[in-house]
């Protein structure tokens, strides 16, 4: 179920936290996937009669969950994504009441289904069929076995898969979590990815090409836009309604948000509430629910640091299992294997391709900016070349000390040392010339010999060259 009304609330009140992105944004990323969510989608395909709806093995058991999971997983690999599948463990005690309600709803749906079948009401049949879906242990085991044959890591959570995914993401073992349930945010997932199904909507890239669209939600932006702390956000989700407790009548997401902004926490809100207008449900142990969200039963991420490994797929074992035990056609399996082989190493290649080819769409404004940038670069290059030429000329003019461009630290130190000698000699030379000119001005032709300036310059240059050679 997730958090009631949270998705719509975020769209209206924290729109900056939700971004539409192309699947190319996940190239090379490790993504944790809530496996049960995907399995539910493919089992629902049976009821809706889609492309996986009528697939069974020789025993008459549905294989739509296998076919759907295999096909979508290969699509992930072809897109350069590295998936990690996380499966649910034992549900927390606080969820038992919700699970009992779900069981009752399935039983009621089964009764409605039988009635609709008798009446031939196809629309009601379709709706009630979907409501009777329940993932079995055998179906989960099938998918786990298939993923291991593909060489993809599989994690079995101690309790809620979404809590385990959040732990992996918070500790940096995965980039984001792919799920459709909003309570992944409540467990503290920094980045939630929705619609990673290659079918929901399209996204136009910089070149105008239509690509599969993802919805990415950043928790940090959610909190900053709403002006809430993480604990206040958890309280907001509890008040909205979740799988672990009942809801307060008359309080939806927006009302809960306004109350939290005013009173800061659930405790104060409950004390200030008009109990006649907003009676508390029988099961509303918000303290335990808050603890479950903030400190869930998970395997610590450090346990997986050396275990999240992608191995070479066992294509022979996969083919044999699909053909002999699941009644897949040989042609179909051969096609799967070919795609898996081609996807191998896709991550590195697609990363390079995207780095060199993904360029912003050129508009008239962008073109003008590019021209300005080009002009600035040309000016910088011209100045740089002038500086280099000046440096080379000044050095060569004073004894051809160095003609190559300074490239290393040693070259730079050598250049500075030589240049210092040159500057000192220039200064001394100027002082000598000034002194000689002063002598000539203050002396008569009879008592002062004429100084040969040309000879003096040659003498200074010779002395300078000798000093440089000595230093070398």
From Swiss-Prot:
Mg(2+) 2 binds at residues 181, 183, 243. One of its GO terms (biological process) is base-excision repair. Residues 1-106 are annotated as: N-domain. It is found in: Nucleus, Nucleolus; Nucleus, Nucleoplasm; Mitochondrion. One of its GO terms (cellular component) is nucleolus. Binds 2 magnesium ions per subunit. They probably participate in the reaction catalyzed by the enzyme. May bind an additional third magnesium ion after substrate binding. Gene3D superfamilies: 5' to 3' exonuclease, C-terminal subdomain, 5'-nuclease. Keywords: DNA damage, DNA repair, DNA replication, Endonuclease, Exonuclease, Hydrolase, Magnesium, Metal-binding, Mitochondrion, Nuclease, Nucleus, Phosphoprotein. It comes from the Eukaryota. The keyword Nuclease applies. DNA binds at residues 47, 72, 160, 241, 243. The keyword Repeat does not apply. It is an enzyme of class 3 (hydrolase). Its cofactor is Mg(2+). InterPro entries: 5-3_exonuclease (IPR002421), 5-3_exonuclease_C_sf (IPR036279), Flap_endonuc (IPR023426), HhH2 (IPR008918), PIN-like_dom_sf (IPR029060), XPG-I_dom (IPR006086), XPG/Rad2 (IPR006084), XPG_CS (IPR019974). CDD domains: H3TH_FEN1-Euk, PIN_FEN1. Phosphorylated. Phosphorylation upon DNA damage induces relocalization to the nuclear plasma. Residues 348-356 are annotated as: Interaction with PCNA. Pfam families: XPG_I, XPG_N. GO terms for molecular function: 5'-3' exonuclease activity; 5'-flap endonuclease activity; DNA binding; magnesium ion binding. Residues 124-263 are annotated as: I-domain. HAMAP family: Fen. Interacts with PCNA. Three molecules of FEN1 bind to one PCNA trimer with each molecule binding to one PCNA monomer. PCNA stimulates the nuclease activity without altering cleavage specificity. Belongs to the XPG/RAD2 endonuclease family. FEN1 subfamily. Structure-specific nuclease with 5'-flap endonuclease and 5'-3' exonuclease activities involved in DNA replication and repair. During DNA replication, cleaves the 5'-overhanging flap structure that is generated by displacement synthesis when DNA polymerase encounters the 5'-end of a downstream Okazaki fragment. It enters the flap from the 5'-end and then tracks to cleave the flap base, leaving a nick for ligation. Also involved in the long patch base excision repair (LP-BER) pathway, by cleaving within the apurinic/apyrimidinic (AP) site-terminated flap. This is Flap endonuclease 1. It comes from Cryptosporidium muris (strain RN66). The gene is FEN1.
């Amino acid at each position: 179920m997730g958090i009631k009304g949270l998705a719509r609330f975020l769209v209206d009140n924290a729109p900056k936290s939700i971004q539409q992105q192309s699947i190319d944004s996940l190239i090379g990323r490790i993504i944790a996937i809530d496996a049960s969510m995907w399995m539910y989608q493919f089992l629902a395909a049976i009821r809706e009669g889609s492309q996986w709806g009528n697939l069974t093995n020789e025993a008459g058991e549905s294989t739509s969950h296998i076919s759907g999971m295999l096909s979508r997983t290969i699509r992930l690999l072809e897109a350069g994504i590295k998936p990690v599948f996380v499966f649910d463990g034992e549900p927390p005690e606080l969820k038992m009441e919700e699970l009992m309600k779900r069981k009752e709803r399935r039983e009621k749906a089964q009764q409605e289904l039988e009635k609709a079948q008798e009446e031939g009401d196809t629309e009601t049949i379709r709706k009630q069929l979907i409501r009777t879906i329940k993932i079995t242990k055998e179906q989960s085991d099938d998918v786990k076995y298939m993923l291991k044959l593909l060489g993809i890591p599989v994690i079995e959570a101690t309790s809620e898969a979404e809590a385990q995914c959040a732990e992996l993401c918070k500790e940096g073992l995965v980039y984001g979590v792919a799920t459709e349930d909003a309570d992944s945010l409540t467990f503290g997932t920094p980045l939630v990815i929705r619609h990673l199904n290659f079918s929901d909507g399209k996204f136009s890239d910089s070149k105008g090409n239509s690509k599969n669209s993802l919805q990415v939600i950043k928790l940090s932006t959610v909190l900053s836009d709403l002006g809430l702390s993480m604990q206040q956000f958890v309280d907001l989700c509890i008040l909205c309604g979740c799988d672990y407790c009942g809801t307060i009548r008359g309080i939806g997401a927006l009302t809960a948000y306004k109350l939290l902004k005013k009173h800061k926490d659930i405790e104060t809100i409950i004390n200030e509430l008009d109990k006649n207008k907003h009676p508390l449900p029988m099961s509303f142990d918000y303290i335990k629910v808050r603890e479950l969200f903030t400190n869930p039963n998970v395997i610590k991420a450090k346990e997986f640091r050396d275990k999240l490994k992608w191995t070479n797929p066992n294509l022979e074992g996969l083919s044999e299992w699909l053909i002999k035990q699941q009644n897949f056609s040989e042609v179909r399996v051969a096609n799967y294997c070919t795609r898996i082989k081609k996807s191998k190493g896709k991550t590195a290649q697609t990363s390079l391709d995207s780095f060199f080819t993904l360029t912003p769409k050129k508009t008239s404004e962008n073109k003008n900016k590019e021209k300005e940038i080009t002009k600035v670069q040309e000016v910088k290059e011209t100045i740089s070349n002038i500086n280099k030429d000046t440096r080379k000329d000044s050095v060569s003019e004073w004894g051809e000390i160095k003609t190559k461009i300074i490239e290393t630290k040693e070259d730079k130190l050598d250049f500075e040392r030589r240049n210092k000698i040159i500057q000192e000699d220039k200064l001394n030379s100027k002082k000598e010339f000034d002194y000689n000119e002063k002598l000539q001005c203050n002396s008569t032709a009879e008592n002062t010999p004429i100084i040969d300036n040309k000879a003096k310059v040659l003498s200074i240059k010779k002395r300078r060259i000798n000093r440089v050679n000595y230093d070398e």
